[in-house]
């Protein structure tokens, strides 16, 4: 290509100019035959696939440089840390506009991770960082695996800065030079909110992300709402016994006033989980809990056990392909769980739940679809306590009903819950101005007994809402209209809540 600006003319007063630009495009070149010279050490097909070239792709100096970088990164991903790639491309050798390109590949030795050296630890135990990268030692160098481990460490919140540099430490060995600056480990946080069902709420959380200098978080949280009080002590070990498994141990106590009764609960929950892939997490849990139900406004014959000990064990798994956990704009998540309580003959049941959510952005608008179901199966003559039953209706289920108001009720209108439920949601969110957005939605769901599992007696809701976007999720105001009211139903319900409905 040639550019000619000789036609430029300056005005008589010298304050302006007429600029004439003549462009001669010249011949058009495309990428021609690709060859590999030197000592590639890999099959040609594998190298071509790594380049991911399109047919008759344009030939430009930038395109050639990008191909060189891509090939070098590919070799490094296979452990060839010092791979050298030279490009030979000469337009004078072009035939019919196609320029042949030769890559001279000298991968060198395949490197493995050797030692890990951490610098900058203060409150953290010096061995902490070495143990976090220990599983990589002795293995072939892989930048992607190293990046994943780096991101895992950043998410702990333990570091103000973290740099991980592979440094050659022998003919085929790399040393990981880890340089850190620790963040403040101790924290205190406060929260204040309001929800349609819980009313005004407030809370305080005190935590130490570096408990006993081992990088494990311990926190105490106290929460109050107009429905009651809850205290919780939580210990998390993301690497129990320095493995890939995570332990969550929680001790809690709560006092709540529900519709038709009050309850006090003390319990312990232990959960063990592991991420087997970046998108699949699975685990198991056990729960021990004592509960006392009091201040009954419901006939005791409809409530089930009012004082019991829950001892349950269960399995869970999550497939999460969302692009953002708190504010997704694409992807889907599937969560399932199943547990069993059969140690106490008065309280014996099996329970299973499933939840699926899908998100897709269309420009600045967002379509969300959701489906949920749960089933509790009593064992023998056991009754399910009212507080362990499923409920439906509210800000995250069928929004044409107030909280827990969909389903069986006693003569006074108190919800009784059920052993099988479904919820289906569809919502379209759209921008209005700035952080303010709107929504239209439709919901459906039902609530039935354990022996009457079906999609009969579905209840529906259609509605509109407002959304105010925050970095951690939206504040929601919704009104759901009931298009098929039955005796005792209200025409609809307002909801004020935080986060996504499903």
Give each language-model segment a name.
Residues 1-196, 205, 219-237, 263, ...:
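Periplasmic polypeptide-binding modules associated with outer-membrane biogenesis and secretion
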Residues 67, 198-200, 227-229, 262-266, ...:
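Residues that define the transmembrane beta-barrel architecture of outer-membrane proteins
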Residues 133, 185-196, 202-210, 214-225, ...:
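Transmembrane beta-strand segments that form the barrel wall of outer-membrane beta-barrel proteins
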Residues 155, 187-190, 285-287, 294-435, ...:
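C-terminal outer-membrane beta-barrel translocator/porin domains of Gram-negative envelope proteins
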Residues 160, 186-188, 199, 211-218, ...:
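Repeated loop/turn-to-beta-strand initiation elements of outer-membrane beta-barrel proteins
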Residues 170, 194-201, 220-231, 256-263, ...:
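Solvent-exposed loop/turn segments connecting transmembrane beta-strands
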Residues 206, 314-315, 464-470, 474-475, ...:
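Outer-membrane beta-barrel "beta-signal"
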Residues 231-307:
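Transmembrane beta-barrel wall of Gram-negative outer-membrane proteins
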């Amino acid at each position: 290509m040639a550019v000619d600006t000789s036609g430029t003319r300056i005005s008589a007063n010298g304050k302006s100019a007429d600029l004439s630009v003549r462009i001669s495009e010249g011949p058009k070149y495309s990428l021609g035959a690709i060859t590999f010279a030197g000592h590639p050490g890999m099959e040609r097909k594998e190298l071509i696939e790594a380049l991911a070239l399109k047919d008759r792709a344009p030939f430009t100096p930038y395109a050639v440089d990008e191909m060189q970088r891509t090939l070098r990164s590919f070799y490094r991903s296979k452990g060839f840390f010092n791979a050298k790639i030279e490009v030979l491309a000469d337009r004078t050798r072009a035939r019919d506009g196609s320029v042949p390109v030769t890559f001279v590949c000298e991968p060198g030795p395949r490197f493995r991770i050797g030692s890990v050296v951490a610098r900058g630890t203060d409150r953290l135990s010096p061995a902490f960082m070495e143990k976090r990268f220990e599983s990589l030692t002795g293995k072939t160098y892989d930048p992607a695996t190293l990046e994943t481990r780096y991101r895992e460490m950043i998410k702990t919140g333990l570091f103000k800065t973290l740099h991980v540099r592979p440094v050659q430490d022998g003919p085929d060995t790399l040393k990981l030079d880890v340089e850190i600056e620790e963040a403040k480990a101790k924290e205190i946080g406060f929260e204040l909110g309001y929800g349609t069902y819980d009313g005004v709420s407030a809370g305080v959380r005190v935590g130490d992300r570096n408990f006993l200098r081992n990088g494990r978080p311990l926190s105490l949280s106290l929460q109050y709402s107009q429905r009651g009080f809850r205290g919780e002590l939580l210990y998390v070990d993301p690497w129990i016994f320095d493995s890939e498994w995570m332990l969550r141990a929680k001790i809690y106590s709560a006092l709540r006033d529900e519709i038709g009764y009050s309850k006090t609960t003390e319990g312990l929950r232990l959960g063990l989980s592991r991420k087997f892939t970046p998108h699949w997490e699975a685990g198991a849990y056990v729960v021990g809990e004592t509960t006392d139900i009091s201040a009954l406004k419901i006939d005791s014959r409809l409530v089930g056990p009012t004082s019991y000990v829950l001892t349950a064990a269960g399995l869970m798994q999550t497939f999460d392909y969302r692009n953002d956990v708190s504010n997704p704009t694409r992807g889907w998540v599937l969560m399932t769980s199943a547990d069993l309580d059969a140690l106490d003959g008065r309280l014996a049941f099996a329970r299973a739940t499933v939840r699926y959510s899908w998100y897709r952005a269309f420009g600045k608008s967002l379509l969300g679809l959701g489906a949920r179901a749960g089933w509790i199966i009593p064992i023998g003559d056991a009754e399910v306590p009212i507080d362990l039953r499923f409920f439906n209706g509210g800000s995250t289920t069928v929004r044409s009903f107030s909280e827990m108001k969909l389903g069986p009720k006693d003569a006074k209108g108190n919800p009784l819950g059920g052993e099988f439920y479904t919820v289906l949601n569809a919502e379209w969110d759209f921008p209005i101005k700035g952080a303010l957005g709107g929504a239209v939605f439709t919901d459906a769901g039902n609530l039935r007994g354990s022996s009457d599992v079906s999609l009969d007696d579905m209840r529906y809701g259609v509605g509109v809402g407002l959304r105010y976007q925050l970095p951690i999720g939206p504040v929601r105001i919704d009104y759901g209209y009931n298009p098929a009211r039955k005796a005792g139903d209200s025409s609809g319900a307002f909801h004020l809540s935080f986060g996504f409905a499903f």
